[in-house]
Amino acid sequence: MPPSGPRAALFLLPSLLLLRAVLAVPLERGAPKEENPATESPDTGLYYHRYLQEVINVLETDGHFREKLQAANAEDIKSGKLSRELDFVSHHVRTKLDELKRQEVSRLRMLLKAKMDAQQEPNIQLDHLNLLKQFEHLDPQNQHTFEARDLELLIQTATRDLAQYDAAHHEEFKRYEMLKEHERRRYLESLGEEQRKEAERKLEEQQRRHREHPKVNVPGSQAQLKEVWEELDGLDPNRFNPKTFFILHDINSDGVLDEQELEALFTKELEKVYDPKNEDDDMREMEEERLRMREHVMKNVDTNQDRLVTLEEFLASTQRKEFGDTGEGWEQGKAGVPLPMAPVLTLQTVEMHPAYTEEELRRFEEELAAREAELNAKAQRLSQETEALGRSQGRLEAQKRELQQAVLQMEQRKQQQQSHNNPAPGPEGQLKFHPDTDDVPVPAPAGDQKDVDASEKKVPEQTPEPPQLDSQHL
């Protein structure tokens, strides 16, 4: 069972209306009980859950507001009369509430900016004031302080949103069931005749097993509560006492039975039909039946419709004639249609009594076909774009290879030129010098060589000049 406590009960209910029951003085017990450790409030599923929780936590610290809340009735809370008491809370509490609102406005602005950035082009000026108007749980005209109008809007919005939570759950389950049936029919169409008959036989066998189980009692009836009293509480069924039963199952001792505490009472009945160890049993169907059972009890027992069952409401329900009627058991009918607390016909599971009509299934299949066609078209476009990118990549790779080949050829030619201009060293490392061909004398032809030799022979020898006499010797 999920955690429950004063704040846990609060967040399962539509608004601050629940605070009155949460803060009520607990029933006297024979022996004092140790205080249960504080548990975190379960998530309501609202996108402003944290803001709602923090506002309530702050308001709980103010003695004046707490006193007015205990004296208020449901109409005072829903009409906004309680919200006006915010003007009399302490300055310290108002300061905390102002800071909470500024943080919430900042958070919503960030969400809006992220959303707009994902949908629009950059550099577009946003009108945050108009955008904040789509959030109905705060006053967008005043973005800095928490006023009575903010508390009123928070109560109204949470009341509406949480009241629609069960309806949204039923709609989600309906779509889940239609998708299952759609896939089952498509699977049967893909089979041969013999295989299809075998699959249909297995389905009929599964449905037959669901019909063969112990009787499921009407939720909230004497028979159902006595079974819990005997099998879960281990007490004598002949000594059943409604007040004692209420106290035993008020787990957090806050004087009321919240939705989670009520749903825990139906586990024994649901286990008669659904076995978690059996793969053929759909646990989502079991939880849908649990929700329907809780709605049925709330409709017949919760007279002020605050989604809490007080001791007075519980005891009053046990005085009705229907409380002792046995009938044939609980009928599991269409999802979201609570049945009256009265004798009903034989049990029908969700599989035997679908949560949808054939017309709804037809429209759902048309919606799936349109979505599938859209996805196929998108997949085809992506495939074509992928092929185009592949071809472009191939061309780029070819150009890259050509460029690399050209660079390689240029390097080779450069190396060849350098090796031609620079002689290679000899075996002992010395350079081999090759004289320039322009400085080497060209030998004359053989005939000319004789003339050259003869001319050399005809050259007369030069006679030495006579010595000159010095003038001093004369």
From Swiss-Prot:
Xref: InterPro entries: EF-hand-dom_pair (IPR011992), EF_Hand_1_Ca_BS (IPR018247), EF_hand_dom (IPR002048), Nucleobindin (IPR040250)
Biological process according to GO: small GTPase-mediated signal transduction
Keyword Transport: no
Segments of this protein annotated with the region Disordered: 190-218, 382-474
Binding, Ca(2+) 2: 302, 304, 306, 313
Positions bearing Phosphoserine: 83, 383, 471
Main location: Golgi
GO cellular component, one term: Golgi apparatus
Domain EF-hand per the UniProt entry, residue ranges: 237-272, 289-324
Compositionally biased tracts (Basic and acidic residues): 190-207, 448-460
Subcellular location: Golgi apparatus, cis-Golgi network membrane; Cytoplasm; Secreted
GO molecular function: calcium ion binding; DNA binding; G-protein alpha-subunit binding; guanyl-nucleotide exchange factor activity
Coiled-coil spans in chain: 147-215, 355-422
Transmembrane domains' residue ranges: none
Positions bound to Ca(2+) 1: 250, 252, 254, 261
Membrane-related topology note: Peripheral membrane protein
Endpoints of the signal sequence: 1-24
Stated family: Belongs to the nucleobindin family.
Subunit description: Interacts (via GBA motif) with guanine nucleotide-binding protein G(i) alpha subunits GNAI1, GNAI2 and GNAI3 with higher affinity for GNAI1 and GNAI3 than for GNAI2. Preferentially interacts with inactive rather than active GNAI3. Interaction with GNAI3 is inhibited when NUCB1 binds calcium, probably due to a conformational change which renders the GBA motif inaccessible.
UniProt function note: Major calcium-binding protein of the Golgi which may have a role in calcium homeostasis. Acts as a non-receptor guanine nucleotide exchange factor which binds to and activates alpha subunits of guanine nucleotide-binding proteins (G proteins).
Protein's name in the database: Nucleobindin-1
Gene that this sequence comes from: NUCB1
